[in-house]
C-alpha cells in the first residue's frame, strides 16, 4: 500500500483513464497536495463517482490475517451492492466483513486512529500506565466523534467497529506501527531516528499535521487537545 503522503506523486504516473474503474482503497490519511481524503481525491481529481469508490477499514491488522486469526473488516461505499460484493470477496473462515455507507466518516476515522495510536505509544514510552492510557483512549473516541461530526455530519454510531474498534486495536496492538513509533518518541527518539529504525511508515505522523490544518481552516474549529499535543 502506498502511504497517503506519497499518493499524489504515484497517481500522476498513471497513463490509463481510471474514470470508469471501481477503486478499493486501503490507504489511510489525507493527500497533502490537495488536502483531500483518498476517496475525495479520486472523486474530485479523477471524476470517479463515490458509488465506485470503496474504503477498507478494520479493526484488522495484516499480521493477524497472515496468521489466519479471526479478523474483522468494514467495507464502506455509497453503493451497498458493490460494498457487499467486495465484502463477500474478502470474507473467509477467519475474515468477517460488514458494510457501511459512511465512506467519508470511515476515512476520517482510520486517519485519526493512527494519530491517537501515536499518542498511546508516547504515553507508554514515557512510562505512563494502563490507567492513564484507558482515559486517553476514552478521550480519543470523544475527540474523534467531534472531529468527524464537524467535517461530515450524518447519523453514525461512533461505537461501531469501524470507528471505536479500529481505534482500540491500533492504540493497543503490538502490531501497530503508529503505537511503536509513538513509543520510540516517548523514549526519547527523534522523529527521524524513529523512522529510520522502524523502516516502516507510521501514517499517523503525516496525518497529525493534516488533521490539525483541517481543523484550523474550518470556520468553526473544534477542540482537539490530543491531536494538538501530538
Q: Across the structure, where does each feature detected by a protein language model lie?
A:
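Rossmann-like NAD(P)(H) cofactor-binding subdomain of soluble oxidoreductases
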Residues: 1-68, 86
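Electropositive phosphate-/nucleotide-binding environments in soluble metabolic enzymes
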Residues: 1-4, 8, 17, 32, ...
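Generic structural signal for well-ordered alpha-helical scaffold segments
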Residues: 12-15, 43, 145, 149, ...
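A short linear boundary/processing microfeature
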Residues: 16-17, 92, 187
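Short beta-strands and strand-loop turn motifs
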Residues: 22-27, 100, 224-227
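Glycine-rich beta-alpha junction loops
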Residues: 28-30, 57-61, 79, 101-106, ...
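Internal alpha-helical scaffold of NAD(P)-dependent oxidoreductase catalytic cores
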Residues: 41-53, 70-157
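NAD(P)-dependent Rossmann-like dehydrogenase/reductase catalytic/cofactor-binding core
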Residues: 113, 120-124, 128, 149-230
Amino acid at each position: 500500500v502506498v502511504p497517503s503522503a506519497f499518493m499524489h506523486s504515484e497517481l500522476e504516473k498513471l497513463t490509463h483513464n481510471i474514470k470508469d474503474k471501481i477503486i478499493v482503497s486501503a490507504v489511510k490519511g489525507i493527500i497533502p497536495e490537495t488536502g483531500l481524503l483518498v476517496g475525495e481525491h479520486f472523486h474530485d481529481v479523477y471524476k470517479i463517482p463515490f458509488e465506485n469508490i470503496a474504503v477498507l477499514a478494520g479493526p484488522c491488522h495484516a499480521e493477524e490475517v497472515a496468521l489466519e486469526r479471526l479478523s474483522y473488516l468494514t467495507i464502506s461505499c455509497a453503493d451497498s451492492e458493490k460494498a457487499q460484493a467486495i465484502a463477500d470477496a474478502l470474507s473467509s473462515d477467519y475474515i468477517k466483513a460488514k458494510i457501511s455507507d459512511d465512506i467519508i466518516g470511515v476515512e476520517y476515522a482510520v486517519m485519526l486512529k493512527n494519530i491517537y495510536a501515536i499518542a498511546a505509544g508516547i504515553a507508554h514510552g514515557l512510562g505512563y500506565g494502563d490507567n492513564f492510557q484507558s482515559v486517553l483512549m476514552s478521550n480519543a473516541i470523544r475527540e474523534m466523534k467531534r472531529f468527524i461530526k464537524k467535517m461530515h455530519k450524518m447519523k453514525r454510531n461512533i461505537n461501531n467497529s469501524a470507528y471505536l474498534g479500529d481505534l482500540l486495536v491500533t492504540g493497543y496492538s503490538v502490531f501497530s506501527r503508529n503505537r511503536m513509533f509513538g513509543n520510540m518518541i516517548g523514549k526519547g527518539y527523534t522523529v527521524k531516528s524513529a523512522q529510520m529504525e522502524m523502516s516502516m511508515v507510521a501514517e499517523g505522523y503525516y496525518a497529525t499535521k493534516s488533521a490539525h490544518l483541517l481543523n484550523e481552516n474550518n470556520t468553526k474549529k473544534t477542540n482537539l487537545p490530543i491531536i494538538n499535543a501530538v
